[in-house]
Design a protein with these regions (language model features):
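Conserved nucleotide-sugar donor-binding catalytic segment
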Residues: 74, 113, 131-231
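Short, well-formed alpha-helical segments that are part of the catalytic scaffolds
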Residues: 9-23
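Conserved small/polar residues in nucleotide/adenosyl-binding loops
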Residues: 252-258
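Short aromatic/hydrophobic "clamp" motif used to bind/position activated sugar donors
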Residues: 81
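A conserved acidic beta->alpha catalytic loop
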Residues: 20, 27, 35-44, 61, ...
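Conserved donor NDP-sugar-binding/catalytic core segment of glycosyltransferases
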Residues: 93-132
């Protein structure tokens, strides 16, 4: 299991994220931390961990979390890939439960879980941020065809920090995040994967996903960010048709029907 943690200036939270990996009941992992040229104390905090399973790379120039994540993927040697953001927290049994599922169900390309929302003080905030909580909590298992239709109509509802990806499946769809879709790179990757592989949603909240109101934070809303995300998701939807192979004619038909509604 290779775990990718991309960080930029998260000195307040990164230790909590790292500790949640170290405390996993599943122990056969490597944690690859890519620091994207942080200017706070992040690098000192990262270097304070002496666990031999932790690998680090410190970038000299800030790029983007997607670029940093791709660097981590290139370093990964595990059969599975998981990604944790530097401000999120995993429950102790997350990896054990998901790896067991993936071992027993080899047809699936990705296993996700549901999440609890936490605030800046690491307190549960499912009610406070009910919209984002319900987005992730109401997700249910679907066929590949149903997922494609859902993604095209509704956008992303899957939490990146909850995913365990089979590395062979990731390599089958290009192996990396697409840097042409920075800001919606998770959504675009899920699109590519779902066309090729079924995915599974575990009905347990195995992640504490941090949501902040502060301006400029990754998880915060702003009008400009809403517009940018909408435009990016529209681009991803359009690109999806290029990914569909000729043998998936039914998915093309469903996709065209959906595109006619949002184009």
């Amino acid at each position: 299991m290779s775990i990718i943690l991309a960080n930029y200036n998260e000195e307040k939270y990164i230790a909590e994220a790292i500790e949640s990996v170290i405390n996993q009941t599943y122990t056969n992992w490597e944690l690859i931390i890519i620091d994207d040229a942080s200017t706070d104390r992040s690098q000192d905090i990262i270097n304070s961990y002496k666990d031999s399973r932790i690998k680090t790379r410190f970038c000299k120039k800030n790029n983007h979390v997607a670029y940093a994540s791709n660097l981590g993927i290139d370093m990964a040697i595990g059969e599975y890939i998981a990604k944790i953001d530097s401000d999120d927290v995993w429950e102790a049994e997350k990896l054990e439960k998901q790896v067991l599922f993936m071992e027993e169900h080899t047809e699936y390309g990705v296993c996700f879980s549901k999440v609890n929302i936490i605030d800046e003080d690491s307190k549960e905030a499912n009610t406070k941020f009910s919209d984002i909580f319900e987005l992730f909590d109401n997700v249910k298992n679907r066929s590949q065809e149903e997922w494609i239709k859902y993604f095209l109509k509704n956008g992303n509802c899957l939490c990146n920090a909850s995913a365990v990806i089979r590395k062979a499946a990731l390599e089958c769809v290009g192996g990396h995040y697409n840097l042409a879709f920075v800001g919606a790179e998770d959504y675009e990757l899920w699109m590519r994967l779902i066309i090729k592989f079924p995915i599974y949603i575990m009905d347990e909240r195995l992640v504490r996903y941090r949501w902040e109101e502060a301006a400029g934070k990754i998880s915060g809303f702003s009008l400009g960010k809403i517009y940018a995300t909408f435009n990016l998701q529209t681009m991803v939807k359009s690109k999806m048709f290029d990914y569909m192979s000729d043998e998936r004619s039914e998915e093309r038909r469903v996709g065209k029907e959906c595109r006619s509604r949002w184009s």
